[in-house]
Structure formats: structure tokens, C-alpha cells
């Protein structure tokens, strides 16, 4: 619950009376006009959930590339243990996301925007998170990658709170769609 959503400098109220409840592994998508405060709301949700001990939330901002180590290969970036079995498992996941063996060994900086996003999303899902908070998760995907990512997110066992303008993502991944406006956050029936 948020009484009012303001800009970062708190100069302007973007929306008031925001209530959002998530049950279990619900997949929620927030839509609304550009500039209404969707990203600001998502940041606040991420901040709030990161404070809780009963939830492990991971946040994917629109500018996620700043968080990736672009000099590492996808396998090295995703491998936290150095264990041979873990590296094999990571390669299998990457293969299921349409990576070639060659792409798995290239520095992340040489990959397409969609391939970088897949690395980031996979790192989130391998982290043990039970809530993913995603700001425009499909914006960099090619028509070939989109279905694979939507399926991966649909099958994620935890909850997802996201913002998207992608109609296919909304239709295939979201259980509930909310509209953010100056009047607050309303469930789309």
C-alpha cells in the first residue's frame, strides 16, 4: 500500500491510493500511459521487497546492462560455484534459450541486446529468488527469442511483478493486469 507515488525529487505526485496484493506465484503486469510512474512504482516495490526477510526478490531495471559484467562470458557470469556440474547445467539452460556453444564463450559485450537480457533473466532465476520484478523484460528480444523468454517466465515457480507494453507478454505471462493512472492502481477486469 502506498498513499502517494511521487517523482524521485518528490516535486510531483504521479498517483495516489496504490494497493497491490500478490498471492503465491501470481504473475502481475502493470500497464499505463508513458510518464505515469510505472518505473517509479516498480523501483519502490523492489526497494520495499528487498527489506523483507521472508521474500527473495530480484529486480531487472530497463538499464540492466549496467549491472552485467560485460567482459565475462555468459557461463562465467552465471557460474557462482566453479563446480563442473554447475557449469554443465548453465550450458544446458543457455542452450534451451537458443545460445550456441560459441555464444556461451564470447564476452557478454559482444552479444545482442536480447542475448544480454537472457543472461540477466537467467541469473535472476538461478539466484533462488521467489519474486522477479521486471521493467519491460521483453523489450530487447527478437521475434525468435520472445516465445522462449515468455515460456521461461510463465514457468518461473515464483511471483512476477512487471511492466510491459508487449501484448504477447501480457497475454501469455500475466495472470493479472493492473492499470496505473493518476487515480491509482486498478485491476483490469
Identify the residue ranges that each predicted region occupies:
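ABC ATP-binding cassette signature C-motif
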Residues: 1-189
Amino acid at each position: 500500500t502506498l498513499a502517494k507515488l511521487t517523482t524521485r525529487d518528490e516535486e510531483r505526485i504521479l498517483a495516489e491510493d496504490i494497493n497491490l496484493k500478490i498471492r503465491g506465484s501470481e504473475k502481475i503486469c502493470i500497464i499505463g500511459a508513458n510518464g505515469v510512474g510505472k518505473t517509479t512504482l516498480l523501483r519502490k516495490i523492489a526497494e520495499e521487497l528487498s527489506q523483507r526477510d521472508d521474500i527473495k526478490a530480484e529486480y531487472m531495471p530497463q538499464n540492466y546492462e549496467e549491472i552485467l559484467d560485460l567482459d565475462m562470458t555468459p557461463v562465467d557470469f552465471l557460474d557462482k560455484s566453479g563446480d563442473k556440474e554447475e557449469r554443465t547445467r548453465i550450458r544446458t539452460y543457455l542452450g534451451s534459450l537458443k545460445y550456441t556453444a560459441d555464444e556461451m564463450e564470447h564476452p557478454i559485450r559482444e552479444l545482442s541486446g536480447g542475448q544480454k537480457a537472457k543472461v540477466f533473466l537467467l541469473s535472476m532465476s538461478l539466484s533462488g529468488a521467489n519474486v522477479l520484478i521486471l521493467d519491460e523484460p521483453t523489450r530487447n528480444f527478437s521475434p525468435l527469442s520472445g516465445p522462449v523468454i515468455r515460456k521461461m517466465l510463465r514457468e518461473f515457480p515464483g511471483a512476477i511483478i512487471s511492466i510491459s507494453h508487449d501484448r504477447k507478454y501480457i497475454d501469455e505471462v500475466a495472470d493479472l493486469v493492473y492499470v496505473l493512472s493518476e487515480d491509482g492502481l486498478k485491476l483490469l477486469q
